[in-house]
Every structure is written in structure tokens, then in C-alpha cells.
Amino acid sequence: MPICAPSSDSSASASSGLGARVWVLHGLALGAAAAAAAVAYLYRRPTGFRSRAVGIIPARFASTRFEGKPLVPILGKPMIQRTWERVMLASSLDHVVVATDDERIAECCRGFGADVIMTSASCKNGSERCCEALKKLDKHYDIVVNIQGDEPLIEPEIIDGVVMSLQRAPDAVFSTAVTSLKPEDAFDTNRVKCVVDNLGYAIYFSRGLIPFNKSGNANPKYPYLLHLGIAGFDSKFLKIYPELPPTPLQMEEDLEQLKVLENGYRMKVIKVDHDAHGVDAPEDVEKIEALMRTRNIQ
């Protein structure tokens, strides 16, 4: 037998060893594939977790500062239509409706093609109006996004970000957005400020400047945050939200999101680079129209 020719026993042993190594490598490959699949699943989880989202635009005619605000024309279209058209561009929403207690607003919205849900005049705020509208919807939704009707330039990306952040934070029942606070807005009580923790969860909201240093002046080097008027709710939580009793901080600041925090619930916050362009008073309309002209928005 040639020296280099293996015996039958050694051939079997070599073959067995090779097979073992193949199975080990195969097992490692399967393990790596399984790990990769698990990571991919976690990354893609938003497509299955809280997957269905509805955008609700609460609108009321009565307002102490600006009566009939939803119907005010902005470059030829009612403001509520401008807002609805922007919201319809959000890719994360399965459905968009306007919730109102005023037939004038409802008729206007139906005229440009929006779905409308009539709600009672007893709703204390937009969140309660969204809750009532949610209960009247035929389909089930996991997330409800409350988009204020006086945001004719709202960016669809903000809506998508609010939805995605709630999908990726199972311990949160509420999500919202902030942007950088402009120095001139530091002490404007109509501009709500926010502070967040290192994980992106809300700590507090205030009409005053927060954090507030002992000098009593705004720190030009500190990245203060401005709260944007958008809220994403876990639909189960939204249904119980109106039943939660008012809280001291909520009533003192007149900020409904504080009721969420004071009752021990978690709120996810995303930071965006878009400015706030809400219409709070009649003089804001001209500013919005000028901005739209510069952006060539028809």
C-alpha cells in the first residue's frame, strides 16, 4: 500500500472529522442567520407593533382669540384644508379624519374631500375630541395622532416620526416632537418648552423657560427645546385619558400633556429641525402667507 494512501480507518476518521467541521460551520452559519433575523425583526418591528395609525385633526369654530380660525382663508384655501392636505402626505397614516362639533367646518371639509366625524361641543380639548372621534371610527387603530388644525405648514416627516417613535417605544403611551427654541421666544408663554432625559423621554413641559438658571436670563449656549403641537397616543391609552382626573401641574400650566406625566405614564419625544408655524392670532395669517410665497406653495 503506498505510503501516502490512507487506510480505510483513517479515511473514515478523516471523513467523519470533515463532516463534523461542516456541521459545526453550518450550525454557526445558521446561528448567525438567526441572530441577524432577530435583529432585523426588532428593527422592523414597527411594521407589526402598533402598526395601524389614524390622523385626527380636531377643529372648533369658537375661540376666544380667533373665532372661526379653521375657516380663515390662507392664499385662497381654508386653513383646515391647508392642514389636511399636508397631513395627507404622511406615509405612516392609514386614515385621516377631521373631528369637529361645528356644521360649518364639517361642510367645508366635506367639500374638499375630507372625512368628517361630528363630535360633541362638550369636549374640553383636542385630545378629548380625538378620543370621541376614535370611538366612532369603524376600524381599529393602534395609534392616534392628534394634529392641530392651525398648522397649515406641518411637515409630514414630523407626523411619521411621531408615529415611528411610539412604535419603537413599547413602554410609552404618548409621543410628541420638539425643535430648537429661538432666543426671541424664550419668555413667550405661548411657546411651550420641554426638557427630556438621556433616553428621549419627556421630563417636563412649561410655559416658562426650562431649565431656568439662577441668573434669570436665557443662556445663549444652552439648547432649549420648543414643543410642537402634535401628539401621538396609544389608542388604548387615549380611550382612558379623558377619565384621568386633572392634575395640579396640568391646571397650573394649562398644558394637557402634563396630565400624562403626572399620572406616571411615559412620553417619547423626537427632535426635529423644522420650525413651528402655527396660527394663534389673526396677525399670524399674513406671516404664513408670506412664508408660503417664499416656498412657492400654491
From Swiss-Prot:
Localization per Swiss-Prot or TrEMBL: Membrane
Keyword Cell wall biogenesis/degradation part of the UniProt annotation: yes
Catalysis: reaction(s): 3-deoxy-alpha-D-manno-oct-2-ulosonate + CTP = CMP-3-deoxy-beta-D-manno-octulosonate + diphosphate
Tissue specificity note: Ubiquitous.
Keywords: Cell wall biogenesis/degradation, Magnesium, Membrane, Nucleotidyltransferase, Transferase, Transmembrane, Transmembrane helix
Membrane topology label: Single-pass membrane protein
Activity's dependence on pH: Optimum pH is 9.5.
Any one GO biological process: CMP-keto-3-deoxy-D-manno-octulosonic acid biosynthetic process
Transmembrane regions: 22-42
Pathway the protein takes part in: Nucleotide-sugar biosynthesis; CMP-3-deoxy-D-manno-octulosonate biosynthesis; CMP-3-deoxy-D-manno-octulosonate from 3-deoxy-D-manno-octulosonate and CTP: step 1/1
Other comments on record: Rhamnogalacturonan II (RG-II) RG-II is a structurally complex pectic polysaccharide present in the primary cell wall. RG-II consists of a linear 1,4-linked a-Dgalacturonic acid backbone with four distinct side chains, two of which contain apiosyl residues. Boric acid forms a diester with two apiosyl residues from separate RG-II molecules, thereby covalently cross-linking two RG-II molecules as a dimer.
The protein's name in its UniProt record: 3-deoxy-manno-octulosonate cytidylyltransferase
Species this protein is from: Zea mays (Maize)
